[in-house]
């Protein structure tokens, strides 16, 4: 059964029993009950519904932002590693300019100048977080561009774009997968921090960081507890996946 509500597309029943925007002034600041499993906040909104909906927002920001940073980082890193010379120098200087600013401060500055919506948050995180991916891809290309299969491809006149994206890139993606898992965790933390400070997902759309901020503002301990636990467990899980992928894919750790 699918039901719709204001400022959202859909919710899936019964996972989200109430609209995350629905208020019930009779049931404000309730603890856990049969009707409201995780209780309600100061305006009577069901915390469980807001948490489930907030997970979609926070995870969407994480995945899309990492997708943007991977796209930028892979393209620029591949060009720098394959061509070298002035192309490499130009991209390296661009990377140095970006990383000379504190990451969170740069993202906060970008979001302050953009209209406040979830897509601009994804873009801001994505266009700042690509430098690590670019360096990883560049390093892999520097190692692989002198291999025999690349030399053979050049000898038969294969276009550079095909060599880069069809021959070299698939052989150098292993460290990128590891970086992506850490990137998702980092993006979720950044989005939560932005929402906590009031620069994230616009009100009233719930995200974990915004729920955390609401609980702090109204001095509601249990409202802050649940999103805090969710953020901690999600970020820890992605970091553990990243560690496992690194252990499995990095040949240097098998020596």
Where are the regions that the model predicts?
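Gly/Trp-centered helix-boundary motif
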Residues: 1-70, 74, 78-79, 187, ...
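Generic hydrophobic transmembrane alpha-helix motif, especially the helices
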Residues: 35-41, 45-47, 58-147, 175-177
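Glycine-rich helix-loop "coupling/hinge" segments at transmembrane-helix boundaries
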Residues: 99, 110-115, 125-126, 140-141, ...
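Transmembrane alpha-helices
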Residues: 56-72, 142, 161-193, 238
